[in-house]
């Protein structure tokens, strides 16, 4: 394995560095302005008396000699349309600074990461501007949406990776890494979770006639008729994974019926043009036989419904991601993955025990009775979040726990970077004379 030098832009806590050092990389400098991230970074890579943090990239021109430039470029709100407006947002302007640094310093290769919204069809023009800018600088450019789950990380985390190689050096042709199979479950990774009584087989990768991977939705029931990996606590959708507040709080069968009627009709266009619309008493009375308005008021007191000043009713928990009582999803210990860790925090928790059932309805009922009502679930810890992101147990974090969740959520998953680094090694970029370390 050849050594190579790299510079870590938007370094955060060092996710890129961990990955590239595992495949022969030597970090010659980093750039970061978040003071909490800087503290964690230097706890894990102490300085030798020299500050190698380049600071604000908007103020940088010439970089130290390096072979590969990497970074998780902060995302802009990817809803901008039009070439002349694509980088008006200050966060979008950072892409222009990255392109400028590539132009000035001409690294042999680069790897940049961004949120999956960058490849949304609505943002196609923004993506094309970025790709074309690199191509105009003489680079072969490749991009792909990669999920950390496919690289041994027990997290459903989609991110866009843009890889560039100087055209004159891309002699062997770069290709993105293959997916890796894994039979790990959350009870293997998180602390003090109950293992299932029977061994769960790994789910094989399925391919079509052309050898291409057949993608499986992460929010669908697992193959072979297995029960779902998690439950969603919400009042605005229905399905085998959904649990509603009226199934948790003490309610009569009549009250449950009223709530289901409202849930099934609130998206009807006759009540408004939103995805979900408040409904008046008369609207609901047309759908529920012999409805008394006092019945709705009781549901308001139970914090299942809310009433607006105009008299219309809506669910108290009206936002899907807000969940119920602050919890959105509860994952089972035998789940293959956890929800996406984000810098803004999350409302996902982990069940402490497994449940079983003869069918989906019994499985759901047992979950409510054995996990949900007795509150046998909890948030994940910082060390667990780090493991779910692919950080080693020896990694040192900040003393501020809330800061740690933000920093981990902002980081790239090191195992994905390891896989990308290996692919760069396969191109044999670092056998050239420019790569003297």
Swiss-Prot record:
The record's top EC class is transferase
Per the database record, which ranges form the SAM-dependent MTase C5-type domain? 4-431
Q: Does the keyword Transferase apply?
A: yes
- Name the Pfam families on file: DNA_methylase (PF00145)
Catalytic reaction(s) noted: a 2'-deoxycytidine in DNA + S-adenosyl-L-methionine = a 5-methyl-2'-deoxycytidine in DNA + S-adenosyl-L-homocysteine + H(+)
Identify the keywords attached in UniProt to this record, alphabetized: DNA-binding, Methyltransferase, Restriction system, S-adenosyl-L-methionine, Transferase
Query: Per its UniProt record, what CDD domains does this chain match?
Result: Cyt_C5_DNA_methylase
Catalytic site positions? 75
Q: What is its EC number?
A: 2.1.1.37
A Gene Ontology biological process in which this protein takes part is:
methylation
Q: Which GO terms describe its molecular function?
A: DNA (cytosine-5-)-methyltransferase activity; DNA binding
* Top-level taxon: Bacteria
- State its role: A methylase that recognizes the double-stranded sequence 5'-GGWCC-3', methylates C-? on both strands, and protects the DNA from cleavage by the HgiEI endonuclease. This system is more active than isoschizomeric RM.HgiBI.
Please report which protein family the annotation says this sequence is part of.
Belongs to the class I-like SAM-binding methyltransferase superfamily. C5-methyltransferase family.
Task: List the NCBIfam families hit by this protein, alphabetically.
Answer: dcm (TIGR00675)
Any idea what this protein is called? Type II methylase M.HgiEI
- Please tell me the species this chain comes from: Herpetosiphon aurantiacus
Q: What is the lineage of its organism?
A: Bacteria, Bacillati, Chloroflexota, Chloroflexia, Herpetosiphonales
Q: What gene is it encoded by?
A: hgiEIM
């Amino acid at each position: 394995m050849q050594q190579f030098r790299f510079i870590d832009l938007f370094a955060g806590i060092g996710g890129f560095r961990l990955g590239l050092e595992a495949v022969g990389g030597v970090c010659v400098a980093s750039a970061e302005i978040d003071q909490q991230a800087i503290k964690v970074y230097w706890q894990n890579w102490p300085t030798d008396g020299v500050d190698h943090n380049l600071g604000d990239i908007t103020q940088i021109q010439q970089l130290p000699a390096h072979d590969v430039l990497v970074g998780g470029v902060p995302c802009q709100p990817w809803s901008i349309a039009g070439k002349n407006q694509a980088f008006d947002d200050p966060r979008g302007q950072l892409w222009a600074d990255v392109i400028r640094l590539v132009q000035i310093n001409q690294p042999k290769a680069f790897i940049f990461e961004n949120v999956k919204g960058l490849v949304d069809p609505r943002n196609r023009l923004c993506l094309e501007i970025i790709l074309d800018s690199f191509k105009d600088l003489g680079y072969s450019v490749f991009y792909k949406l990669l999920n950390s789950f496919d690289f041994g990380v027990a997290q459903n985390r989609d991110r866009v990776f843009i890889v560039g190689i100087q055209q004159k050096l891309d002699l062997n042709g770069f290709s993105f890494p293959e997916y890796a199979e894994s039979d790990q479950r959350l009870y293997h990774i998180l602390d003090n979770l109950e293992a299932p009584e029977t061994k769960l087989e790994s789910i094989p990768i399925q391919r079509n006639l052309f050898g291409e991977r057949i993608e499986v939705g992460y929010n669908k029931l697992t193959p072979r008729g297995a029960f779902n990996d998690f439950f969603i606590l919400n009042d605005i959708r229905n399905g085998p994974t959904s649990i509603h507040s009226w199934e948790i709080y003490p309610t009569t069968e009549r009250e449950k019926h009223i709530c289901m009627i409202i849930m099934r009709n609130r998206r009807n266009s006759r009540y408004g043009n939103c995805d979900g619309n408040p409904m008046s008493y008369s609207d609901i009375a047309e759908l529920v036989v012999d409805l008394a308005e006092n019945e709705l008021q009781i549901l308001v007191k139970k914090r299942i419904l809310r009433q607006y000043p105009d008299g219309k009713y809506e669910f108290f928990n009206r936002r899907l991601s807000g969940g119920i009582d602050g919890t959105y999803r509860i994952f089972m210990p035998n789940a293959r993955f956890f929800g996406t860790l984000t810098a803004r925090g999350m409302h996902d928790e982990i069940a402490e025990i497994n449940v079983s059932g003869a069918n989906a309805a019994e499985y759901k009922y047992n979950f409510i009775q054995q996990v949900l009502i007795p509150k046998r679930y909890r948030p994940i810890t910082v060390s667990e979040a780090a493991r779910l992101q692919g950080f080693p147990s020896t990694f040192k974090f900040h003393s501020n726990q809330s800061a740690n969740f933000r920093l981990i959520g902002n980081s790239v998953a090191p195992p994905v970077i390891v896989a990308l680094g290996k692919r760069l090694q396969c191109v044999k970029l670092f056998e050239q004379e420019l790569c003297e370390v």
